Design a protein with these regions (language model features):
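Extreme N-terminus of proteins, especially the signal/transit-peptide cleavage junction
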Residues: 1-7
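Long, low-complexity, intrinsically disordered segments
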Residues: 297-310, 316-340
Length: 340
């Protein structure tokens, strides 16, 4: 007899109503369902059906008008902002249509970043991030920044970042919306394979019925209500890339500068720099706590603030090094906690 799977998400008569003047709009209207551990669940619907609003409610991004949502047995509607933010950090991961990578950081640093908030040491988090980037076929692009990567590559970094801290649940909102058809299938393969590897739950919003072939459960949403729920015991499985992308410049074979001796030249695009500047753990943690105290914090939804904080710390560290060389260390700004 097959063992019954553990329920990790339970939605009970969820309702979300918006007001536009005197008019009430029922974005989510009395929805109830469960999602089990390790399940790949798709919320399928057309634009305006309420599927993204439902995802935001499940993730605690928006508040219910009525009803209740339990994540891992805990009612998220009863949590205050700080407890909810901490709960999301500990249990949830996010993949977005717009990638939401931090532009001033490399692929490796973007994947490492969620681990900072778990107070994981530099060496361990670096190792975890490298492993995740290799899983998604980007071991050769760890030092590339978002602007140096294609949309598909950026989304793979986003997937690696979402899964690196091993969250119980990953929410994905139209993760292939900005990708071409070939890259879409590659990303879906990786998303499903990553979830299966550690028995993680994925809830994905999509308008594309073709993508639901990867789903174990399909919840069809229409006008804020559940039209039907389909179970697919033989859903399409995913796979990790069978190759590792390498920048074109690395593919050129070069003769050793001194035959007979090991060539010491290293391509900086493919190697992890030992001296990569990464925000000090305690400093960036204080930035997070300061943000939490002003109304709640979520890693992916606060990327602009985090980018500003991270870039400021990076700039000040560089400035401090320059000042030391010039004997001007006393003139370095001390207001690193003031992030707007």
């Amino acid at each position: 007899m097959e063992e019954k799977k553990k329920t990790v998400i339970e939605v009970r008569d969820a309702k979300k109503v918006y007001r536009m003047g005197q008019e009430k709009i029922k974005a989510v209207d009395g929805v109830s369902f469960t999602v089990e551990e390790g399940e790949f669940c798709c919320l399928l619907g057309t634009s305006g059906s309420g599927k993204s609003t439902l995802l935001n409610l499940m993730a605690g991004i928006e508040k219910l008008t009525k009803g209740e949502i339990l994540i891992k047995g805990k009612s998220i509607g009863k949590m205050n902002e700080n407890k909810l933010a901490k709960f999301r950090q500990d249990n949830l991961g996010f993949v977005f249509q717009s990638y939401n990578l931090i532009g001033s950081m490399t692929a490796l640093e973007n994947v490492e970043f969620p681990l900072v908030f778990k107070r994981i040491g530099t060496g361990k988090r670096r190792k975890m991030a490298i492993e995740m980037l290799k899983n998604v076929g980007l071991g050769g692009r760890m030092q590339h920044k978002p602007k140096e990567m294609s949309g598909g590559q950026q989304q793979r970094v986003g997937i690696a970042r979402a899964f690196v801290a091993r969250p119980a649940i990953v929410f994905a909102d139209e993760p292939t919306g900005n990708l071409d058809s070939k890259t879409t299938l590659e990303v879906m393969d990786m998303l499903k394979a990553m979830a299966r590897k550690n028995n993680q739950t994925v809830v994905m919003v999509t308008h594309d019925k073709k993508l639901t072939e990867y789903a174990d459960k399909i919840i069809n949403i229409l006008d804020g209500k559940i039209e039907s729920i389909e179970i697919q015991p033989n859903s399409k499985e995913g796979k990790f890339p069978e190759y590792e992308e390498t920048p074109a410049e690395e593919k050129k074979t070069e003769k050793p500068s001194n035959p007979g001796k090991k060539d010491k030249k290293k391509d900086k695009a493919s190697k992890v720099k030992k001296d990569t500047v990464f925000p000090n753990l305690e400093d960036i943690q204080s930035e997070v706590e300061a943000t939490q105290n002003t109304g709640g914090f979520d890693l992916q939804y606060e990327t602009e603030k985090l980018e500003a904080a991270a870039q400021k710390l990076i700039d000040e560290e560089k400035a401090a090094k320059m000042a030391e060389q010039d004997g001007l260390s006393e003139m370095i700004s001390e207001d690193t906690n003031n992030v707007s």
